[in-house]
Amino acid sequence: MNNEEKKVNEEIVVEDQIEAIGTEADVEWNESMEESQDAKIAELEAALLASQAQLKEQQDAVLRAKAEEQNVRRRAEGDIDKARKYALKKFAGELLPVIDNLERALESGDKENEAAKVLLEGVELTLQTFISTIEKFGLTVINPVGETFNPEHHQAIGMQASPDHESNTVMVVMQKGYSLNEQVIRPAMVMVAQ
């Protein structure tokens, strides 16, 4: 092989290498494509992170909304219960004078008179039925004879010396007290031993 053939072969090899590598513009284009793809990947990663953050915020908002809904429901149930108790308390308070009057009728009635005796028995049955009915709704009688004076349940009308009773003990109940579901509606009016 002569020099010319060698030169031609070398040129062909160089041309093949140039074609394989491509032009400088092709190299720049490839590099810019890689940069573009890297930028696109970074942009997509940022969008993914933003979407994940937004999803977390929305999940938190849903949880807060559920908690608020439960709180509103609990408050509403509590308000309904309070309204029911208040209405029952007010109603029971209005019934107390009726009970007092029935008890006074029994105390002042003539038990010796046969005609009055039958009437008093009817009043007593009415009173017992009335009291048992209101007890079903949580109303209880406070009749503290012999108990230690408790200012939360008793109202002292006066104090009196008594050798038969310990100091600060209820001797006499002037007017019975009543409580509804363990809440005093009317304290018992009492005389307390000194």
Curated annotation (Swiss-Prot):
It comes from Aliivibrio salmonicida (strain LFI1238). HAMAP family: GrpE. The keyword Cytoplasm applies. This is Protein GrpE. Signal peptide: none annotated. GO terms for biological process: protein folding. It is found in: Cytoplasm. Homodimer. Belongs to the GrpE family. Participates actively in the response to hyperosmotic and heat shock by preventing the aggregation of stress-denatured proteins, in association with DnaK and GrpE. It is the nucleotide exchange factor for DnaK and may function as a thermosensor. Unfolded proteins bind initially to DnaJ; upon interaction with the DnaJ-bound protein, DnaK hydrolyzes its bound ATP, resulting in the formation of a stable complex. GrpE releases ADP from DnaK; ATP binding to DnaK triggers the release of the substrate protein, thus completing the reaction cycle. Pfam families: GrpE. The gene is grpE.
